[in-house]
Regions:
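Conserved small/polar residues in nucleotide/adenosyl-binding loops
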Residues: 176-180
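A short, charged/proline- and glycine-enriched loop
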Residues: 108-118
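Short, well-ordered secondary-structure micro-motifs within conserved domains or adaptor modules
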Residues: 154-171
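Structural motif
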Residues: 45-46, 120-126, 167-171
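A short, well-structured beta->alpha microelement
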Residues: 23-25, 140-157
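Long, charge-dense
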Residues: 55-95, 99
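Short, charged N-terminal beta->alpha structural module
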Residues: 5, 119-142
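Metallocofactor- and cofactor-centric catalytic cores in central/energy metabolism, strongly enriched
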Residues: 3-36, 43-53, 58, 73-82
Length: 180
């Protein structure tokens, strides 16, 4: 679901002329980085970084304990909303993986499932995980987190899954059967 807070950095021609767009973005990120409200702040650049002059890699990785994730999603290179969400999921998983590699992290709220789990990546309707879970159950599998995740700890659970199911109208599957 799209129940996430969305902020933006207002800018005008003065910002562009003075070349302060990156500074304005950096200041806005510092303002937003309140650990009482956010686990992470994702900054999305919808332009090519070299053209926009917004080098998101120069933002800090963390401010006040809030993760800062910069992603470049150029509009002409990423044609659909779903694919942009895949880029977001990849950036979030990469950040979470680095945290896991650095040391202990919080356990997912529901704990670890006793069955192998399948992370689900892509466009999902609210009932989809339950229906998919019911289909996986006879195989001894369980539905894992949906990515992009609503809660940061779900990313750690996704990294612990046995496999990923790419659920997306643009993903296709080729089934291979060996000749008998």
């Amino acid at each position: 679901g799209a129940r996430r807070s969305v902020g933006y950095v207002p800018f005008n021609s003065e910002t562009l002329v003075t070349g302060k767009l990156f500074e304005d973005i950096r200041d806005a990120v510092h303002e937003l980085a309140d650990p009482d409200h956010y686990d992470a702040v994702v900054v999305t650049n919808l332009c090519v970084p070299t053209a926009s002059g917004v080098p998101l890699r120069l933002l800090p990785n963390e401010i006040n304990g809030v993760r800062i994730i910069g992603i470049d999603v150029p509009g002409f290179g990423v044609p659909t909303h779903a694919e942009a969400k895949d880029i977001l999921a990849g950036a979030m998983l990469n950040f979470a993986r680095q945290e896991v590699e650095a040391g202990p992290v919080q356990s997912p709220k529901g704990g670890k499932n006793d069955r192998p789990t399948i992370a689900m990546l892509g466009e999902m309707f609210p009932a989809d995980p339950m229906v998919i879970g019911a289909m996986l159950d006879p195989m001894g599998l369980a539905a894992g987190p949906v990515l992009p995740a609503r809660e940061w700890r779900e990313l750690y659970a996704a990294l612990d899954c046995e496999a990923v199911a790419a659920i997306h109208p643009f993903y296709t599957c080729l089934l291979y059967t060996s000749p008998s």
